Amino acid sequence: NTLGGAGAEKALLELLKRFPKEQYEISLYVLLDQGELILQVPSHVKVLNREYSDASVLSREGKKVLNKKIWKRLWIHGAVFRNFPFLIRNTVAMIKKGKISPDKLLWRVMSDSGQVIREHYDMAIAYLEGGATYYVHDHVNADRKFTFLHVDYGFAGYTRELDKNCYPDFERIFTVSDEVKKSFVKAYPECSKDTYVFHNLIDQKEI
């Protein structure tokens, strides 16, 4: 969703490095157009974002940039209005459970206000749960679609209602550990045969 300096984002960069540039044409779209790791994206990867900030999402200045961007995105394509019933319904559900997660509510809006990409792809991969998964599911035209999960699905606050039951539509679902897989399959038992464990790749030299 961003390219900040966290573990999942670093693992994504390592994965991009592993694809032979002679065999694959790779494009990358970062949903929230921000993160310092953009400077480390392999040169053969085409970055689709028309605008981008390399400010760290953890820095004071970077947080200002990100918050301003999120506020602006609420109104693009009428995303917040289109999702208003969804936001109300899921906010009420969260209140009943005693835990409100604003970020989970906003992912759908951020997905629907993302950049319009008209190209058709052989394969599209959402590397993070939440906004990236929703964006690939709803707005990317591709023959095959895969997605990744890096967090305990239930503990993180995700629900089928928040997802709009999008996961069964993915051909493959990759989780970064057996524990993450177990949590996800508990929520989506029908996806068990299409869910695989794919451990994060690590740059041994960097360590």
Where are these regions (language model features)?
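Short amphipathic alpha-helix
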Residues: 8-19, 33-40
